[in-house]
């Protein structure tokens, strides 16, 4: 749930539906005694395969705000990949970390890895 939802890869985007899917995954994990860590959705200014979507940055930021609020309200660790990976204009995935504007490169994953490792270590 996240980038693919905003890109409307399967259905028209609905923020409530996407957040609901995330909440459902969290609840399913908790019922099965799986520790949960939530992360922000990575930034994306546009989707080359869906150029008609013009407001991706705003949708991603709004969804991230809700994911973070849900995590805080439910005492779930939250990793903010967005801030670590966003461009200077606060809209796109930093070009240092992507070739297509959506998917991280190895260098991008190098930025993300210590963030999630720290959250995992803290959660254990």
Give the residues covered by each predicted segment.
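Catalytic His-Asp segment of secreted/periplasmic serine-dependent ester chemistry enzymes
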Residues: 43-124
């Amino acid at each position: 749930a996240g980038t693919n939802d905003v890109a409307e890869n399967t259905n028209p985007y609905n923020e409530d539906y996407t957040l609901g899917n995330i909440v459902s995954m969290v609840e399913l994990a908790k019922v099965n005694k799986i520790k949960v860590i939530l992360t922000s959705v990575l930034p994306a200014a546009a989707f080359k395969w869906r150029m008609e979507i013009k407001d991706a940055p705003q949708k991603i930021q709004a969804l991230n705000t809700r994911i973070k609020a849900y995590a805080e309200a439910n005492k779930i660790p939250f990793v903010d990949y967005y801030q670590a990976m966003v461009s200077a204009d606060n809209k796109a995935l930093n070009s240092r970390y992507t070739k297509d504007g959506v998917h991280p490169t190895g260098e991008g994953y190098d930025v993300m890895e210590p963030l999630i490792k720290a959250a995992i270590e803290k959660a254990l």
